[in-house]
Amino acid sequence: MVLDKILRAGEGRILRKLKAIAEQVNLIEDDFTGLSDGELRGMTDEFRQRVAEGKESLDDLLPEAFAAVREAARRTLGQRHFDVQIMGGAALHLGNIAEMKTGEGKTLVSTLPAYLNALAGKGVHIVTVNDYLAQRDAENMGRVHRFLGLTVGVIHPQMPPPVRRAQYACDITYGTNNEFGFDYLRDNMAWSADELVQRGHNFAVVDEVDSILIDEARTPLIISGPADNPTRWYTEFARIAPLLERDVDYEVEEGKRTVAITESGVEKVEDQLGIENLYESVNTPLVGYLNNSLKAKELYKRDKDYIVTDGEVLIVDEFTGRVLHGRRYSEGMHQAIEAKEKVEIKQENQTLATITLQNYFRLYDKLSGMTGTAMTEAAEFHQIYALGVVPIPTNKPMIRNDQPDVVYKTEIAKFDAVVEDIAERHEKGQPVLVGTTSVEKSEYLSKQLTKRGVPHEVLNAKHHEREATIIAEAGRKGAVTVATNMAGRGTDIMLGGNPEFIAQAELRQRGLSPIETPEDYEAAWQEALEKARQSVKTEHEDVVEAGGLYVLGTERHESRRIDNQLRGRAGRQGDHGESRFYLSLGDDLMRLFNAAAVEGIMDRLNIPEDVPIESKIVTRAIRSAQTQVEGQNFEIRKNVLKYDEVMNKQRTVIYEERRKVLDGADLHEQVRHFVDDTVEGYVRGATADGYPEEWDLDTLWTALGQLYPVGVEAPDTDDRDGLTTDHLLEDVQADAQEAYDRRELDLGEGADGEPIMRELERRVVLAVLDRKWREHLYEMDYLQEGIGLRAMGQRDPLVEYQREGFDMFQTMMEGIKEESVRLLFNVEVQIAGQETEAAPAENVAVAPAPPAGAAALPAAVAPLALPDAAEDDRAAARRTPPEVPAAPAPPAAPPVFVKGLEPRRPTGGLRYTAPSVDGGAGPVTILDSGAESPVAGGAARAARGPAGGSAAGASARPARNAPCPCGSGRKYKRCHGDPARRNAEAE
């Protein structure tokens, strides 16, 4: 590929630059070695001051900062950064992806750019693939940063907002891509500034960047709330699906993960349901249930794509083999699988906020990443993220022996050969790591090894609890570890055992922690580490003599990167190692991409099933199949980004407006423009056609009366001579502005002397904006679902989506203005300690008001209903690590409660949808387990408007345009609803 060649053309130049930086660091290393601990720590303050004064940039400080980190790591971890690690750190600081092979110390490399960029005081995010690695790296690498005087935070899924905010206030924050992304979305659902947790997007170092930005990029992050209850149709179609015959009643394309019903199938479904036409408009929703039930039957396999535990369907990550606890497929797919497995069917969801990982990480001012396998995707990194890929040389030459693939005719013959190979290696003491592609196959191989009498460990989605321990011991003499793809990343496999892991385990047993007891931990670390090194030294030599770690792959993955990750477990840091893949013509990759030609050759040559072949034809077929799948997946990711770019522009506008409101911007002038624009829309719409005497001004005045208390009379038909739209508009706009001024005077001022109207404007605009945005997300989802059909009309679906999406966005913005104006004029307001004011009001539902002094939230955005949640938050805040500074909270809002906009406790929690599985099936959802989340669901209820609640003080008063209950025949607003009349009667 031409682009690949162009991208690699500058490798030599950048490597020479990085090598020169490493040499600069080496030249000043002795200067830092001679410093005391206090003097070394004091360098951080000096660096910060030099940056703050603007005398030097971070680039200027790089050699000194890197030298300081190298020395701190030597004193705390007993590890000195190699020159190639210095080069990797510099590549990251310059905004590149550093490709560093397994075992080259990528985690240690991250300390260099993290420290340097933290000196600017804007925060640094270290992004990992799972919570275990985030916690581990925050503890271990955090020792270096804390030694140098920086604060280190870590984000956990169940962390309450006050603690979460404090973690983000640290100089360096560790967490997963999902947590960072969800916090961004939650911040843009917050109702007040003191709920915000993030403080911007300055610099991010993404560990395993290919996994996060490539593998997981097809599926967006989604926060959703409960929608409609599950229907009987899931169960009904789960009953019908087994009655339909594959290739007769429906067709399946496994490569594209699609199903298509045939005419025969349609007839059978119609007979089973007792309907005449499945495709009548009234039956349209049934087609979705049918497709999902067929996908659940054919494309989602138990113990491969998911497992069933305790009556719950749990998704298994395709790339790592881990169980994705709490996550669910969306678009009804998970419910279809639940119906198939005859377990409880849970609720569907409605989107509240969403963003793709591509667009989230493009928010950062500077982005970088690390991985062992990036060059195969260099073009994609460049096109989508504007990131260069820099291959960093290994510290020691790679001496791993990569054996050619062997191919068997059947899967049974392949596994028989695998068992024999493992048994031979185990007998001579060579450790073996076996990679499988599914839980089902790992358990099958485990049974075969047990029959053969080979002791082994199994690491898959059902046995993930001991993952770190199993992998850390996978390099010991004679160890056999059968693992799904989850073994590809995380803990290092060292020959003879991992001394650091052993030392950490010993200190944990002694009750020592680098966070809770840092001084005692540091004092005991070196002794524990040296003891562990001595214990594994002899065993290391025995394993090297046996040939090092042997990596055996039982199947090729559709991505070359996943295969390379498995191979990369062997041969780290110049160790001996060997790798080989055993394949069969029944493997998924071969089966999906035409292995019939190879099978025909083997049949013609009468090759026995237990005799392998090594053929260039097979090698080319595998490479071609993998390239084809990678190309398809790249196109899917590009397509996702193109469509999300439309939403991204709209999301940026909405979120910027929200942030202005939360930051306390004065909305008064903006709301006045809302009033003028809304009135103009009403007037011009009513006067667009015909002569003035033909205008239906009665209807116009009725509409205006529902918007605000109109103070001018509509011109009679006889008085319209010379009347123009502009003249009429000028009169009505002036009247509306006067009414708005009166409304502000009626509300008065708060305890702080500010007009109550300012706080009301903020709350109403925020509530309306959120509700309209949620409705817009639903409509955009609906638009995108069917937009592909435009291609049948010779129209570009993307162009149509962009055009109609823009029109819908404009309509939404006009709707925000109109509804905000209507509510500002008509909603009831209660001031803490006062009676409800008697301004004209719509008959809105009133929820119980929160206690005085509490921040009022919109109906659709309220705290989760948790027992003693406030006390939990306070307790969690008290548990904040001592070195983490408490983030200042903005001042509380005035105690103003807007009736109809008060908080309501949702009946169900939020759901967080994140990537990690095959995007062809739709996203998966993380169920909120009741975490102290800063926001909550209930969007489906909000979209339907205020519901229920106590109507005291509101329902007793008729709507303004309803007939007056006195029987006069006049509208309420012109009779007993007239403020002037009420005041006169009161006198």
Swiss-Prot record:
Keywords: ATP-binding, Cell membrane, Cytoplasm, Membrane, Metal-binding, Nucleotide-binding, Protein transport, Translocase, Translocation, Transport, Zinc. May bind 1 zinc ion per subunit. Its EC number is 7.4.2.8. Its main location: membrane. It is found in: Cell membrane; Cytoplasm. GO terms for cellular component: cell envelope Sec protein transport complex; cytosol; plasma membrane. PROSITE patterns: SECA (PS01312), SECA_MOTOR_DEAD (PS51196). One of its GO terms (biological process) is protein targeting. Its cofactor is Zn(2+). Zn(2+) binds at C964, C966, C975, H976. GO terms for molecular function: ATP binding; metal ion binding; protein-exporting ATPase activity. Residues 936-945 have a biased composition (Low complexity). ATP binds at Q85, G103, E104, G105, K106, T107, D492. SMART domains: SecA_DEAD, SecA_PP_bind. It catalyses: ATP + H2O + cellular proteinSide 1 = ADP + phosphate + cellular proteinSide 2. Residues 870-916, 935-987 are annotated as: Disordered. Residues 882-894 have a biased composition (Pro residues). It comes from the Bacteria. Residues 975-987 have a biased composition (Basic and acidic residues). It is a peripheral membrane protein. Disulfide bonds: none annotated. Belongs to the SecA family. Monomer and homodimer. Part of the essential Sec protein translocation apparatus which comprises SecA, SecYEG and auxiliary proteins SecDF. Other proteins may also be involved. Part of the Sec protein translocase complex. Interacts with the SecYEG preprotein conducting channel. Has a central role in coupling the hydrolysis of ATP to the transfer of proteins into and across the cell membrane, serving as an ATP-driven molecular motor driving the stepwise translocation of polypeptide chains across the membrane. This is Protein translocase subunit SecA. It comes from Frankia alni (strain DSM 45986 / CECT 9034 / ACN14a). The lineage of its organism: Bacteria, Bacillati, Actinomycetota, Actinomycetes, Frankiales.
